[in-house]
Swiss-Prot record:
<keyword id="KW-1015">Disulfide bond</keyword>
<keyword id="KW-0119">Carbohydrate metabolism</keyword>
<dbReference type="GO" id="GO:0016020">
    <property type="term" value="C:membrane"/>
</dbReference>
<feature type="domain" description="Chitin-binding type-4">
    <location>
        <begin position="18"/>
        <end position="244"/>
    </location>
</feature>
<keyword id="KW-0624">Polysaccharide degradation</keyword>
<comment type="function">
    <text>Starch-active lytic polysaccharide monooxygenase that oxidizes the C1 position of starch substrates. Catalysis by LPMOs requires the reduction of the active-site copper from Cu(II) to Cu(I) by a reducing agent and H(2)O(2) or O(2) as a cosubstrate.</text>
</comment>
<dbReference type="InterPro" id="IPR002044">
    <property type="entry name" value="CBM20"/>
</dbReference>
<feature type="compositionally biased region" description="Low complexity">
    <location>
        <begin position="250"/>
        <end position="263"/>
    </location>
</feature>
<feature type="disulfide bond">
    <location>
        <begin position="39"/>
        <end position="42"/>
    </location>
</feature>
<feature type="disulfide bond">
    <location>
        <begin position="65"/>
        <end position="241"/>
    </location>
</feature>
<dbReference type="GO" id="GO:0005576">
    <property type="term" value="C:extracellular region"/>
</dbReference>
<dbReference type="GO" id="GO:2001070">
    <property type="term" value="F:starch binding"/>
</dbReference>
<dbReference type="InterPro" id="IPR034836">
    <property type="entry name" value="CBM20_glucoamylase"/>
</dbReference>
<feature type="signal peptide">
    <location>
        <begin position="1"/>
        <end position="17"/>
    </location>
</feature>
<feature type="disulfide bond">
    <location>
        <begin position="101"/>
        <end position="199"/>
    </location>
</feature>
<dbReference type="GO" id="GO:0046872">
    <property type="term" value="F:metal ion binding"/>
</dbReference>
<feature type="disulfide bond">
    <location>
        <begin position="152"/>
        <end position="160"/>
    </location>
</feature>
Length: 378
């Protein structure tokens, strides 16, 4: 009875759970970056049984990649701004960082998971331009994604607890899924404890929710990573997908022999020891007024960990009215992947973040030791 009352009150008040996959960037997020999806966090499957049974709901038209009724977009097929190519490449066996964004006005706790379907024929139905899968095909794909859950417990050293809002014996009492903090505690935002607007949502600003997953030893030139979040408070489920590529794991080193040979020189495009850190120059064309400055804030310590007071400032030494360029060079660890935004700081200390979804950058692993990122304020 108590559960029914909670559901009824939540729906009556118009409050809805809101969130979407942001790293790797989902189809939903890409369409939001381009502009047409004005509420990426509104891709909701509702009303359905979301708790305590996490997998009993049929996905219907939402499919494993989501349908946003607010903007009438079905993400189970490629669109003009998403789905034509992978946004990231993994190797089988990789441990990868993943992240989603929960809206400040729609954090209803619960549990979430990441899945990969290894039936390429089913996935191809979600990759074919101009083809909209039927609801039966969407459900078949969803069943495959459920079978391909990437357990939290597959990543060594990762904390994989049980939901504080679930009890032993309930279907939600499992730790292969990831859990938010308790609904009476800090909910999903408590996973990272990131500041407000650490990721983009259109309603009330978002908080990042980060985890790590282990990529299966499976090879596909184009497949999908499906994210699913089951709300504790409301009868709602979130489903979004990112287009990814998975290559074969690195081959094992051949067994050693007694043969003596002279080490080969590195090929011209490589080197014996790639740089451990890279001096990355960020160049942002940002029009400012007298007294304003520009900083770069992001999800890693070198960018202040989303703390604007600790974010490094850019220099206006090359700024002109025709070329409003702000620059800075920061030493970053090779291979690091992070989210970031430029922020405009008033002389009063007030801060304005760029609009839209967070930018994402991966520091190159090579011998140059330098890299440049050219952007413009958005």
């Amino acid at each position: 009875m108590k559960w029914s009352v909670i559901q009824a009150l939540a729906l009556a008040s118009g409050v809805q759970a809101h969130g979407y996959l942001t790293f790797p960037m989902s189809r939903t997020g890409l369409n939001a970056q381009a502009g047409p999806d004005t509420c990426p966090e509104c891709t909701i499957l509702e009303p359905v049984t979301a708790w305590p049974d996490l997998d009993s709901a049929q996905v219907g038209r939402s499919g494993p990649c989501g349908y946003n009724a607010r903007v009438s977009v079905d993400y189970n097929q490629p669109g003009p701004r998403w789905g034509s190519a992978p946004v990231v490449t993994y190797k089988g066996g990789d441990v990868a960082d993943v992240q989603w964004c929960v809206d400040n006005n729609g954090d209803h706790g619960g549990m979430f998971t990441y899945r990969i379907c290894q039936d390429q024929a089913l996935v191809d139905k979600l990759l074919t331009p101009g083809y909209l899968p039927s609801e039966a095909e969407k459900q078949a794909a969803e069943n495959c994604f459920r079978a391909g859950t990437l357990p939290c417990t597959d990543v060594n050293g990762q904390s994989c607890g049980y939901s504080p809002d679930c009890s032993p014996g309930q279907a939600c009492w499992r730790n292969d899924w990831f859990t938010c903090k308790g609904f009476q505690d800090t909910k999903c935002r408590g996973v990272d404890n990131a500041p407000l607007n650490s990721c983009y949502t259109s309603i009330a600003g978002g908080y990042t929710v980060s985890s790590r997953i282990k990529i299966p030893n499976y090879v596909s030139n184009h497949t999908l990573l499906s994210f699913k979040w089951n709300s504790f408070q409301t009868p709602q489920i979130y489903l979004t997908c990112a287009d990814i590529k998975i290559t074969a794991p690195d081959s094992q080193s051949p067994p050693t022999t007694t043969t003596t040979s002279t080490p080969a020189s590195p090929p011209p495009t490589s080197c014996a020891t790639p740089a451990a850190s890279v001096a990355v120059t960020f160049r942002s064309k940002t029009t400012t007024s007298v007294g304003q400055t520009v900083k770069i804030a992001g999800s890693i310590a070198q960018l202040g960990g989303w703390d604007a007071s600790k974010a490094p400032a850019l220099s206006a030494s090359q700024y002109t009215s025709s070329n409003p360029l702000w620059t800075t060079t920061i030493s970053l660890p090779a291979g690091a992947t992070f989210e970031y935004k430029f922020i405009r700081v008033e002389s009063s200390g007030a801060v304005t973040y760029e609009s839209g979804a967070n930018r994402v950058y991966t520091v190159p692993r090579d011998c140059a030791g330098t890299a440049t990122v050219d952007t413009a304020w958005k």
